[in-house]
Design a protein with these regions (language model features):
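Residue-level signal for inorganic ion chemistry
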Residues: 31, 84, 113, 134
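Acidic-histidine catalytic/liganding microenvironments
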Residues: 69, 116, 197
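Conserved C-terminal "lid"/linker of ANL adenylate-forming enzymes
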Residues: 121-123, 130, 189-243
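Gly/Ser/Thr-rich phosphate-binding loop
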Residues: 1-19, 30-32, 120
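C-terminal boundary motif of the adenylate-forming
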Residues: 34, 77, 116-142
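Conserved ATP-binding/catalytic segment of the ANL
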Residues: 26, 34, 38-98
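Adenylate-forming
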Residues: 1-6, 49, 51, 55-56, 85-114, 134, 143-180, 199-201, ...
Length: 243
């Protein structure tokens, strides 16, 4: 893990010095987690001979990126464990602040919730809110596999083909998005996964959307990253119903 300003890599994992879910340890210079929250998440910062001296002919940008004592601000959120392994958990610009003033990093929570087998997409809601909630979409491929016994290797990759295959089984996606049983199944997973987070970060409610997020609706970038502003606009009534 690293950036151009750190002369490429600044951390590395290698055989005998590796931990799944981390980007390894510093292999040159120093790394610190600046101003960590209760969960240990703070800005990842670097210092050492491998760090740039500044941006060419741009002292303003340099001053914004470098601290007075020579630490480079990465703009990334992360944490360091007791063995020195670094985990990247989000971006500073994506930090939510609850109505109680708690800083919440949505990315790590969203990725954790996406580990639920039936969940395709998850977007956390919590900025200036009393508690966290989420929008879920269902993974049609997982429905075909887990609810209809379809061989995972034969599940179509194309979302439209997945929906067509679901219809061949005599079902519509709405039967699952509106299903109390599916909601209860997801709730069991959410309750279990919530244990990984502090109380302000835990999901108190969630809503299953009637369709997956899409590029066509402006909700995903071409590289399939979620576009938070557009999603909040498209599903405003569903979000407000959770509060």
């Amino acid at each position: 893990y690293g950036m151009t300003e750190t002369t490429a890599g600044a951390t590395i994992g290698y055989p005998g010095n590796n931990k799944i879910g981390t980007v390894g340890k510093a292999f040159v210079g120093d790394i610190r987690i600046d101003n960590p929250n209760e969960a240990g998440d703070g800005e990842i910062q670097f210092r050492g001979r491998h760090i740039m001296k500044g941006y060419y002919n741009n002292p303003e940008a340099t001053a914004e990126t470098m601290t007075e004592d020579g630490w480079l601000k990465s703009g990334d959120l992360g944490r360091e464990d007791s063995e020195g392994y670094i985990s990247v958990t989000g971006r500073i610009k994506e930090i939510y602040v609850s109505s109680a003033g708690k800083n919440i990093a949505p990315l790590v929570i969203e990725e954790t919730m996406k580990s639920i087998p039936l969940v395709s997409q998850c977007m956390l809601i919590g900025d200036n809110r009393k508690y966290c909630s989420a929008l879920f979409t269902l993974d049609v491929g997982a429905i075909l596999r887990d609810k209809h016994g379809m061989d995972g290797a034969k599940v179509p990759k194309d979302p439209a083909e997945q929906l067509a295959k679901l219809k061949e089984f005599g079902h519509e996606l709405s039967e699952y998005t509106d299903s109390p049983e599916i909601h209860a199944e997801l709730q069991e997973h959410v309750d279990r996964l919530n244990g990984q987070f502090s109380n302000p970060e835990q999901l108190k409610k969630f809503t299953i959307l009637p369709r997956d997020l899409s590029v066509d609706h402006g909700e995903l970038t071409p590289t399939l990253k979620i576009r938070r502003i557009q999603i909040r606009e498209n599903w405003a009534s569903e979000i407000e119903a959770m509060y």
